[in-house]
Amino acid sequence: MQIPKYENKPFKPPRRVGSNKYTQLKPTATAVTTAPISKAKVTVNLKRSISAGPTLNLAKKPNNLSSNENTRYFTIMYRKPTTKKHKTWSGDGYATLKASSDKLCFYNEAGKFFGSSMLPSDSDSLFETLFKAGSNEVQLDYELKENAEIRSAKEALSQNMGNPNPPTTSTTETVPSTKNDGGKYQMPLSQLFSLNTVKRFKSVTKQTNEHMTTVPKTSQNSKAKKYYPVFDVNKIDNPIVMNKNAAAEVDVIVDPLLGKFLRPHQREGVKFMYDCLMGLARPTIENPDIDCTTKSLVLENDSDISGCLLADDMGLGKTLMSITLIWTLIRQTPFASKVSCSQSGIPLTGLCKKILVVCPVTLIGNWKREFGKWLNLSRIGVLTLSSRNSPDMDKMAVRNFLKVQRIYQVLIIGYEKLLSVSEELEKNKHLIDMLVCDEGHRLKNGASKILNTLKSLDIRRKLLLTGTPIQNDLNEFFTIIDFINPGILGSFASFKRRFIIPITRARDTANRYNEELLEKGEERSKEMIEITKRFILRRTNAILEKYLPPKTDIILFCKPYSQQILAFKDILQGARLDFGQLTFSSSLGLITLLKKVCNSPGLVGSDPYYKSHIKDTQSQDSYSRSLNSGKLRVLMTLLEGIRKGTKEKVVVVSNYTQTLDIIENLMNMAGMSHCRLDGSIPAKQRDSIVTSFNRNPAIFGFLLSAKSGGVGLNLVGASRLILFDNDWNPSVDLQAMSRIHRDGQKKPCFIYRLVTTGCIDEKILQRQLMKNSLSQKFLGDSEMRNKESSNDDLFNKEDLKDLFSVHTDTKSNTHDLICSCDGLGEEIEYPETNQQQNTVELRKRSTTTWTSALDLQKKMNEAATNDDAKKSQYIRQCLVHYKHIDPARQDELFDEVITDSFTDLKDSITFAFVKPGEICLREQ
């Protein structure tokens, strides 16, 4: 083998691609001459002799693209791996595939290679495959076919071909080869290989790992730094500015995105809730009619308060107020120095990062829709747990919600589901900043597992929403209050000793004339009101009258059928009641049975109390198979009149599913289209049923179980509602009647209440008119409050005995108690009486002097008369503005449907109370 001859030639610097010019050698200032340089002329060899022979075959880089026409070019999209639900691409680029290779090479838009991946086994899925290239995910977009596109791709990729790995240092000068005639190289090596290192650019700002520039946390800088609120109050029309304490650094201003939609009572509500959750004392407002929501007051701290009870009536917008408060606390904080801020001093995060909303499962969808309606779910992350999830999936979702930031801020969960994920919440309870409990009266039972689970989370800021905070007694009231603000009422033993016992004694009818007990009870009541009004806000739906269409309330007294009267007599005779030992609890089964008779005698045979206590009677078959009743006749006549006389929809409400079954069969026989919602309907189907009824004009009626759906159930597609039977708890009926008269309603509303004349229906109605006294006393409903009657328990055993009496000779027992008018449709004005003065006189005479038996009997008769007068007075107050109408004397009931159907109903309606809306009054 012939070996090429070695020639010792001077070093020749490399030539730049595309350049034929060489720069002359310019010695550097630091060069050291160690030998004299020949004076011979320095020449440059333009021809570099390369010996023939074998050469080193270097491996080609992926950047060195072949010019082979068999190479295929693609456009690509790439991104970093992410777990987000809605993924986006971060960049575009190119991919190449050589015919002789099964490897795709990926480049970014600048032509820089960043990875490669093997082809998938299935060539048909080439464009659906997600490739892994380095730290990126890559997907092919389309293949380049046009010559212009391929040429453009080649140009982009060729930019980095010459220098795929650019060095960090560069040589500033090169030395051409020099030689003299002696052939001896005389350039010093130190000068030949001298390099100038390029210095890296130094940033003038300090390096940080944070994504945003934050304000230094040093105390010295904090004092010098000025902070500013998120919103400029000068650029907002009618802003809502929150109150603050002396330590606040910036104002908290409600986002105008929400603030512009809030009504005056909602603005006040948001500010009240904010004060409570921030632990601020209540301000002293001299004139409550002046709007103070546009000003920020500096208040003292109240260490006893960190929670709030919003007890507004249904329909006042408790959900919207809560969402406004949540959004405000997520975005803003008055303590700017404790969070990251922008360079201009604006807080970048709020006081709360994670908020837990607990509600009935039927309201989860409604809460999420409300967040989407008012904020748009792109602004705030709201997580709900799917009903299809397994328990493990729910637990994982809760863990991710608490630990992963910036994705979800609000978790909405049902009360029952809370128990299954309680362990995950307990482990990370320090991450939950706020708790919202909708329908908070569910937490009234101190032994409830749900209540104890929420207590174990130890969340400081709590907000409870309810329209019925006090339903039975002060024991339940204490449970709710102690959960909101622990310890504010002391221990239960001390609360019972100081408040429950004296207040209960004062309300006991046996102590109605004991001046000492009554005064002590009143004193304790006022003391408790002063404590609770610091964090309880209660408004009635009377303030909605100027925002909603007019509403006409009609109470119709329906004449019972002969079969019903017979059933009442047989049941009461068969029950063999001992009124001496009778209590409300022991007689509850009998009361329920009598209520069913009012609805339809056909419900008697299947009643458990009837089967176990009432034996077979001679006339059982004559009424147990009858479906007729006075209320059913009035109901079907009303439905037919609404369907024919108007284009409106109607909601029919009952407390019993068996009653709904009878009504549903009658509507089917009459060809009335309808839908139904009761406790048997799965929660996930309820929203679709309600939406279908509200939007589908072909659906005429909606059958509703009174206790189904929660307060968030809106049936504004209907403008007429018929309450077929009453519940002992007035809040249940009020909630049911508010389904149609709320935000979103465009038509005048008509509410019909059907009552069986002279029977237990009327007694329940009368009790409802008085049972609100406890809530009115402690929650501030002062408009309809009678201070004297609210101090007494207005029902005793005589009243309970009266429940089981049937008055067949009256047109309305309720009207007989309160009025002696002729029922000509006039509105009766009631003068103030000296009832309170008479009561005080009886108290003094019964406690300060010795009494003989004759005088005692006389006083007892006076007391009974006084009690009846008090009941009448209170019922009259509840029926203020109602017109008294006797159909035998007056055929105008301020409703065209009843008026047009009056010929058919004249023998079925014995009396009516009507409270007309504004439109009805104008028409008259």
UniProtKB/Swiss-Prot annotation:
Q: Biased-composition ranges for Low complexity?
A: 168-178
Composition bias type Basic and acidic residues, residue spans: 1-10
GO MF annotations for this entry?
ATP binding; ATP hydrolysis activity; DNA binding; DNA topoisomerase activity; DNA translocase activity; helicase activity
Residues reported in the UniProt entry to bind ATP: 346-353
Q: Name one GO biological process term.
A: double-strand break repair via homologous recombination
- Give the matching SUPFAM superfamilies: P-loop containing nucleoside triphosphate hydrolases
Where mainly found? Answer: nucleus
Q: Which PROSITE patterns match?
A: HELICASE_ATP_BIND_1, HELICASE_CTER
Instruction: Name the SMART domains on file.
Output: DEXDc, HELICc
The GO cellular component terms are: nucleus
Which EC numbers does the record give? Answer: 5.99.1.-, 3.6.4.12
What is this protein's record name? DNA repair and recombination protein RDH54
Q: Give the species this sequence originates from.
A: Saccharomyces cerevisiae (strain AWRI1631) (Baker's yeast)
